[in-house]
């Protein structure tokens, strides 16, 4: 999987950062992309990335503050203007359906494709056999969620050398054996593919947080993930101000990553008060607690 950050600023865009939007490319022979939040200007950011509105098949909104949703109506209309006919699924908190319906109706807009809007609560939202998405409630002045995305475990590798030693030559039967099936050879012997497979490879796990102050749910959401994306709106010394507005500091995000056993922390949602140089100080605050902390930048793409 790949994550591309289209916007990493909190509240207001700056000259170097747009407001929140993250694209997930699930890959695994999939052509569609998933979008997490859609702040104002997200379409413009897409012009500088590999994503286009027509490639988006699912949108997950964390909460209804403007810096996370004001880009949504334009993106929906652009899909229609481009002649897109593929369905689009939107997931978000209560009110997202009214927001979408109202903005389209009052602007005289419509969609040329099936649009399905799901108002969510805590729990698993989907399981398509390859990926699951689960929503966790967070602490913010409005209803807000974080999303945990998990790949299914992948089959182990087939030990071709052992099979050859057993007299099984490469051929069409190998595909069945890779699936762990039992096959019958021409000489009447049966071979169980599961006996020649290595242990399953664990699927990747990602946690994408919406805006949040400290909450016990955070560690559960991020438990053992490969990548944790968490807001670091303000520096550690401004915890009272950050928490009072439903936000987190560098120190608090790093503590969640450490306590959850995450492998990487991607810091995002920076107050526009911080310059690029000052963000390095924020990074140092996180790394002092959780060394595998990284600054997200607009257009940064990481492989999970």
Curated annotation (Swiss-Prot):
Intrachain S-S bonds: none
Annotated Zn(2+) 1 binding sites: 63, 65, 140, 211
Enzyme Commission number, as recorded: 3.1.-.-
SUPFAM superfamilies on file: Metallo-hydrolase/oxidoreductase (SSF56281)
Catalytic residue list: 67 (proton acceptor)
Cofactor binding comment, as recorded: Binds 2 Zn(2+) ions.
GO molecular function annotations of the record: 3'-tRNA processing endoribonuclease activity; exonuclease activity; zinc ion binding
Residues annotated as binding Zn(2+) 2: 67-68, 211, 269
One Pfam family from the record: Lactamase_B_2
Cofactor: Zn(2+)
Gene3D superfamilies named among the record's database cross-references: Ribonuclease Z/Hydroxyacylglutathione hydrolase-like
Keywords from the UniProt entry: Endonuclease, Exonuclease, Hydrolase, Metal-binding, Nuclease, tRNA processing, Zinc
Biological function: Zinc phosphodiesterase, which has both exoribonuclease and endoribonuclease activities.
Family classification: Belongs to the RNase Z family. RNase BN subfamily.
Self-association state and partner proteins as the record states: Homodimer.
UniProt name for this protein: Ribonuclease BN
Organism expressing this protein natively: Cronobacter sakazakii (strain ATCC BAA-894) (Enterobacter sakazakii)
Classification of source organism: Bacteria, Pseudomonadati, Pseudomonadota, Gammaproteobacteria, Enterobacterales
């Amino acid at each position: 999987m790949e994550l591309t950050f289209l916007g990493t600023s909190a509240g207001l865009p700056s000259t170097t950062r747009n407001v929140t939007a993250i694209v997930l490319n699930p890959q695994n022979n999939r052509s569609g992309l998933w979008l997490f939040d859609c702040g104002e200007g997200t379409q413009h950011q897409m012009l500088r990335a590999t994503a286009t509105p027509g490639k988006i098949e699912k949108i997950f909104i964390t909460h209804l503050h403007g810096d996370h949703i004001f880009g949504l109506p334009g993106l929906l209309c652009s899909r229609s203007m481009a002649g897109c006919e593929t369905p689009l699924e939107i997931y978000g908190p209560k009110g997202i359906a009214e927001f979408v319906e109202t903005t389209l109706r009052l602007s005289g807009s419509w969609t040329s494709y099936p649009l399905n809007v799901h108002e969510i609560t805590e729990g698993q939202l989907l399981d398509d056999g390859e990926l699951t998405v689960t929503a966790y409630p967070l602490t913010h002045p409005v209803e807000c969620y974080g999303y945990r995305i998990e790949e299914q475990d992948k089959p182990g590798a087939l030990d071709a050398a052992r099979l050859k030693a057993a007299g099984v030559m490469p051929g069409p039967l190998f595909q069945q054996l890779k699936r762990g099936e039992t096959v019958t050879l021409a000489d009447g012997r049966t071979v169980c593919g599961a006996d020649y497979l290595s242990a399953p490879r664990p699927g990747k796990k990602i946690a994408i947080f919406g805006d949040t102050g400290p909450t016990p749910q955070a560690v559960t959401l991020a438990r053992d993930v490969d990548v944790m994306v968490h807001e670091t709106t303000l520096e550690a010394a401004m915890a009272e101000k950050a928490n009072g507005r439903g936000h987190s500091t560098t120190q608090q995000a790093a503590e969640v990553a450490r306590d959850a056993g995450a492998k990487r922390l991607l810091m995002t949602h920076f107050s526009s008060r911080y310059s690029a140089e000052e963000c390095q100080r924020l990074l140092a605050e996180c790394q002092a607690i959780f060394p595998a902390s990284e600054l997200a930048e607009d257009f940064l793409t990481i492989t999970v």
